[in-house]
Amino acid sequence: MTSTDSHLAIAASRKAAAFATYDDELLKNAPAFLGLTGLRVQRPSEIISELDSVVRSTIYQYREMRNTGIERHRVKSIKEVELDEFINAKHAEKPQSWAGLVDGALSLPDRFEINQIRDTEGNSLAIVISENAGAHVTKLVRFRVARRLSGTRLGNVITELIASQPLGTSNTVGIRVVKLSDPFPDSSLLLACLRRGFQRFDKEYFRVLLPGVWEHAQMQAALRELVSEHCLPTELGDAFLQLSKDAASGDIASTQRLEALIHPGKVTFGKLPIYVVPIQPEWAQELFDFRIWSRPLLRMDTRLVVNPDSVYYKKPRNSPKGDFARILWYVSGDKQRGGGCIRACSLLTKGVTGTVKDLYREYQRLGVFEWRHLMDHFGKPDAPAFAMEFTNTELFPTTISLDELNSILVEDGMKRQQFVSAVEISQAAFEKIYQQASQPE
């Protein structure tokens, strides 16, 4: 064994991400090493060029969050809040003023609600103090990530998490305009809010939540009502109305954008394709909520989808066409393990075809899967694969069994399906499935 071989073996045994070499023979066999060990054999220049994505990435690798137990928790006592983690000393905030704010909010539970994101040890990761400011308005009085997470990758994903789910994942909040009223919001959180559906107008940030299924006329009436009641600025209301018109005219990109902005709402108009995509139970556990590894699959009291964005790899056959679609996740397998039913819905934002190794290199930071998962499924690095980028995953409170699903499809004029691969369904079938799955158990 040469010195290079020895170092390569050590790198593989220690689960290194990459091995740098000028050895042409090793470089020629790089795909084989990747397939066998998950170790990327590359020239030093290639590693340096990818250093930003491999080492200095600001995007948290979701698979690192497995079993972290991160959860959203309603605060009931001021003792539960680590005030020092959220005080903005730069703007001369004082512990006394924060204590007064928290104490006052707790004394008015019908008007205020305080939620924290915490880890398994009870450490505060983020805080959301919200105020019911009217029939359709919720103000985010304080909306902050803990100072201990500043500059960390975990801090960045928690930032994306609360920006995407300011009021949690509940589908029962009703029509709401969420207004960011924190006097000193962090700039990175503001940017995340803009990525996650907030709209900026006159130095203020607004998010429109329209849960449920909406017809075009019904949505337009609801938006006009929000404007007339001064819940939403006229200019933003007009922009939403125009977007809904564009969607109703058949523009798929506008429909996708509209549903991203009103999440978790869905629309009956537009031409957004819908697919039922099968997924194995263990992969569903990886993608939807890391806390379920030690619990029954997708417990319906789960209120937190930790990864706002993710990627799922499948074989190219019968894959969704185009970049925009709705995905209904059919968890396959044994009913005893939580399979054999529809459990969640997501918004497809991009579909890419390529080899397993190329797609893994592109999406490893976004996905939760390790290389060995892909090798178990696809067999070899050069196998063709299809990567589905998706976001806005919604866990249903009620599952739809295979028999119930097929009854809906047969009623819609389709044949019964076993869902061994992705199946496109109609808007009418989707509405029935979605409305039934959205009902409380």
Where are these regions (language model features)?
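Conserved acetyl-CoA binding element of GNAT-fold acetyltransferases
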Residues: 136-149, 175
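Active-site neighborhoods of divalent-metal-dependent phosphate/nucleic-acid chemistry enzymes
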Residues: 1-18
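Conserved acetyl-CoA-binding loop-helix of GNAT-fold acetyltransferases
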Residues: 150-167, 191
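Acidic, PIN/NYN-like endoribonuclease modules and their adjacent C-terminal/linker elements
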Residues: 17-18, 24-110, 127-129
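Conserved GNAT acetyl-CoA-binding A-motif
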Residues: 166-183, 204
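Short coil-to-beta transition motif at edge beta-strands of beta-rich domains
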Residues: 316-333
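Contiguous surface segments at macromolecular interaction interfaces
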Residues: 188, 194-302, 340, 351-441
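Conserved beta-strand in the GNAT
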Residues: 116, 122-132, 139
